Amino acid sequence: AALVAGMMEGAQKNGFETGGFDAYVSTNVIAAAGVSSSASFEMLICTIIDYFFNESKMSFNDYAKVGQYAENVYWDKASGMMDQMACAVGGPVLFDFADRDNLKYSKLDFPSENLDTDLLL
């Protein structure tokens, strides 16, 4: 519940509208295993906030800032924005962190189906 409260407050502090909602969430992402489970959940909550209350006007940078705020303030965790950006954009991504207020990113063309792997993270 604290993470959702942090997301709502973070969205408001970044100039976005919020409101109440009910959500049932189920996942196979392993919690606390270093696989961006919190960032994945944060991006889901941002998508809900964006779609239902902000006419889908939030950027991936906005999503990442809101998620970072929630982790920094409500979990007292020194979180950056990389996990949030990676989850928001999806797929292989190249980041440029030169301007931390407006991260730049490029989606990479990565033909994973041509690799002889069972699991690719």
Where in the sequence are the language-model features?
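Anion-binding (especially nucleotide phosphate/pyrophosphate-binding) glycine-rich loop
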Residues: 1-66
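ATP-dependent small-molecule kinase catalytic core of the GHMP/sugar-kinase superfamily
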Residues: 51-121
